[in-house]
Amino acid sequence: MDAHLVQAKKTSTASELSDSSLTFPFIGDYLSSPSLTTSDYVSDCSNLTVEGPVPANQEFSSSDESSVYISSALRLADYAFTPDDNIRIKPDAVIVICTQCQHQIQDKFFLSIDGRNYHENCLQCSTCENPLSNKCFYKDKTFYCKGCYFRTHVTSTASSCRELGPKCASCDRTIQATDWVRRARNYVYHLACFSCNQCKRQLSTGEEYALQEGNLLCKQHFLELVEGDSGVSSQKAKTKRVRTTFAEDQLSVLQTYFNRDSNPDGADLEKIASMTGLSKRVTQVWFQNSRARQKKWHQKSEGDNGDSQRSSVGPSSPSQKSDSSSEMMYPTSVTTSVEDAIPDSIVILGSLQFD
């Protein structure tokens, strides 16, 4: 199994874990703040307007835009018009041919673009078929009005640019230029997609993480993975208890819920686990151990002949000494074994303990 960690701050060699072929450190780097993509990707073309400048990487070219001139005065000498606008061409008149239909122009007015002449009805947008006047766009031997030209040649190109952007390593969707991202080695993720592959919890800034075969893992699940693989590779290695250290905010949530209900049901355990970022099994073990400590404390209190009154809102740490002159104190970090939370088929190898 090929496993990688991002810029590990603390490392442990394979020999320290087991005699297996694992060659990766077991703690990942602290996760940095997300960044806003800018010059790494193509610009978003959806905000283009007809009047504004168009980026150089689009297909719009100023040479596609032409002015339409209505010609008549210069040709009046070649025609004789009756009061009812019937046309009579003089014998020495210059023959004007429509570039579009290749027929002679005998109208009172005709249109001229860059030296090319057209009937008024012949010069129209190839998409919406509206007559063109003042401005038109000519591309690939086709005339367009302003709106159709930008919809056909600029907006479609903008969509292509967005589709060619980088893909999120998690959801495989395109990352837009305005998306917030996180980076891990050569992988780029949407901010919301940067989550543990096992517990699906979104990783926060400053949190440690690991990369294993392209999959993101939080610190807890990466350690479980290392322990499981070590157990499979060496059945004769000695087993040592692994203890989990709870953060202060996790303890605060656990203690608050313990004060309300020391024996929560499955739904409450899942809710608490989600709030603390712990697994349901680890949360359940914490409550079991806390109830046991509380029961032991009550039994000891009843045997003290009532010499002191102490609060019974929650369990105390086994490492704490009784103090009759103060209320019961709660530790800022309580360690609880997660040995029971790991499947029986996994044998924990080595000595993995972290603060």
Swiss-Prot record:
<keyword id="KW-0479">Metal-binding</keyword>
<dbReference type="GO" id="GO:0003700">
    <property type="term" value="F:DNA-binding transcription factor activity"/>
</dbReference>
<dbReference type="GO" id="GO:0000981">
    <property type="term" value="F:DNA-binding transcription factor activity, RNA polymerase II-specific"/>
</dbReference>
<keyword id="KW-0677">Repeat</keyword>
<keyword id="KW-0440">LIM domain</keyword>
<feature type="region of interest" description="Disordered">
    <location>
        <begin position="291"/>
        <end position="336"/>
    </location>
</feature>
<dbReference type="GO" id="GO:0006355">
    <property type="term" value="P:regulation of DNA-templated transcription"/>
</dbReference>
<feature type="DNA-binding region" description="Homeobox">
    <location>
        <begin position="239"/>
        <end position="298"/>
    </location>
</feature>
<dbReference type="InterPro" id="IPR001781">
    <property type="entry name" value="Znf_LIM"/>
</dbReference>
<dbReference type="GO" id="GO:0006357">
    <property type="term" value="P:regulation of transcription by RNA polymerase II"/>
</dbReference>
<dbReference type="GO" id="GO:0000977">
    <property type="term" value="F:RNA polymerase II transcription regulatory region sequence-specific DNA binding"/>
</dbReference>
<dbReference type="InterPro" id="IPR009057">
    <property type="entry name" value="Homeodomain-like_sf"/>
</dbReference>
<keyword id="KW-0238">DNA-binding</keyword>
<dbReference type="GO" id="GO:0045664">
    <property type="term" value="P:regulation of neuron differentiation"/>
</dbReference>
<keyword id="KW-0371">Homeobox</keyword>
<dbReference type="Pfam" id="PF00046">
    <property type="entry name" value="Homeodomain"/>
</dbReference>
<comment type="subunit">
    <text>Interacts with transcription factor sox-2.</text>
</comment>
<dbReference type="GO" id="GO:0005634">
    <property type="term" value="C:nucleus"/>
</dbReference>
<feature type="domain" description="LIM zinc-binding 2">
    <location>
        <begin position="166"/>
        <end position="228"/>
    </location>
</feature>
<dbReference type="GO" id="GO:0045944">
    <property type="term" value="P:positive regulation of transcription by RNA polymerase II"/>
</dbReference>
<dbReference type="InterPro" id="IPR001356">
    <property type="entry name" value="HD"/>
</dbReference>
<keyword id="KW-0804">Transcription</keyword>
<keyword id="KW-0805">Transcription regulation</keyword>
<dbReference type="GO" id="GO:0030182">
    <property type="term" value="P:neuron differentiation"/>
</dbReference>
<feature type="domain" description="LIM zinc-binding 1">
    <location>
        <begin position="96"/>
        <end position="155"/>
    </location>
</feature>
<keyword id="KW-0539">Nucleus</keyword>
<dbReference type="GO" id="GO:0042427">
    <property type="term" value="P:serotonin biosynthetic process"/>
</dbReference>
<feature type="compositionally biased region" description="Low complexity">
    <location>
        <begin position="306"/>
        <end position="326"/>
    </location>
</feature>
<dbReference type="Pfam" id="PF00412">
    <property type="entry name" value="LIM"/>
</dbReference>
<keyword id="KW-0862">Zinc</keyword>
<protein>
    <recommendedName>
        <fullName>LIM/homeobox protein lim-4</fullName>
    </recommendedName>
</protein>
<dbReference type="GO" id="GO:0046872">
    <property type="term" value="F:metal ion binding"/>
</dbReference>
<dbReference type="GO" id="GO:0001708">
    <property type="term" value="P:cell fate specification"/>
</dbReference>
<dbReference type="InterPro" id="IPR050453">
    <property type="entry name" value="LIM_Homeobox_TF"/>
</dbReference>
<comment type="function">
    <text>Transcription factor that binds to the promoter of target genes. Regulates genes involved in serotonin synthesis and release in serotonergic ADF neurons. Involved in specification of neuron cell fate, olfactory receptor expression, locomotion, and foraging behavior. Required in AWB olfactory neurons to repress AWC cell fate and promote the AWB cell fate during early development.</text>
</comment>
